[in-house]
Swiss-Prot record:
The keyword Cytoplasm applies. Pfam families: Pribosyltran. PANTHER family: ADENINE PHOSPHORIBOSYLTRANSFERASE (PTHR11776), PHOSPHORIBOSYLTRANSFERASE DOMAIN-CONTAINING PROTEIN (PTHR11776:SF7). This is Adenine phosphoribosyltransferase. Homodimer. GO terms for cellular component: cytosol. It comes from Shigella flexneri. InterPro entries: Ade_phspho_trans (IPR005764), Adenine_PRTase (IPR050120), PRibTrfase_dom (IPR000836), PRTase-like (IPR029057). Its main location: cytoplasm. Pathway: Purine metabolism; AMP biosynthesis via salvage pathway; AMP from adenine: step 1/1.
Length: 183
């Protein structure tokens, strides 16, 4: 099933836009409204599974927290394992970490050291691509463990915030179902 314009429009219309959230001047794209619509949620998963079913993916990595909501069902659909990337102190086994920059300060992500094996072909899944900082840190973690990042997939791409270009500089291609301008 290749995504049709009608299907993609349905997904786009299922995502509510909230003006001035979380602060004035921001137009927030609320992916949780897509999750509330079982047809839209299933369609988003089905389209990603269809796109990657013959790509030789061996692991799907999802970033905390909404990346779990899309990454885990995509992993099930592909018949591969799901690996969570989390904020510090949330994973019980030995981890490695990677810092990344935020608008005001830094944050950190962690992954279990035994979750990715050398040679694993990894699909990174998250709900939204904005500046790309979270995904760039996730890619670095995967590569440090010997994994190959095959692609990064998103439900939403805020295309004018530079995330795609940032990932391209890391040699990562990306795919998104719904483009929106970023605000």
């Amino acid at each position: 099933m290749t995504a049709t314009a009608q299907q993609l429009e349905y997904l786009k219309n299922s995502i509510k836009s909230i003006q001035d959230y979380p602060k004035p001047g921001i137009l927030f794209r609320d992916v949780t409204s897509l999750l509330e619509d079982p047809k839209a949620y299933a369609l988003s998963i089905d389209l990603l599974v269809e796109r990657y079913k013959n790509a030789g993916i061996t692991k799907v990595v999802g970033t905390e927290a909404r990346g779990f909501l899309f990454g885990a069902p995509v992993a099930l659909g592909l018949g591969v394992g799901f690996v969570p990337v989390r904020k510090p102190g949330k994973l019980p086994r030995e981890t490695i970490s990677e810092n990344y920059d935020l608008e005001y300060g830094t944050d950190q992500l962690e992954i279990h050291v035994d979750a990715i094996k050398p040679g694993d072909k990894v699909l990174v899944v998250d709900d939204l691509l904005a500046t790309g900082g979270t995904i760039e840190a996730t890619v670095k973690l995967i590569r440090r463990l010997g994994g190959e990042v095959a692609d990064a997939a998103f439900i939403i791409n805020l295309f004018d915030l530079g995330g795609e270009q940032r990932l391209e500089k890391q040699g990562i291609t990306s795919y998104s179902l719904v483009p929106f301008p970023g605000h």
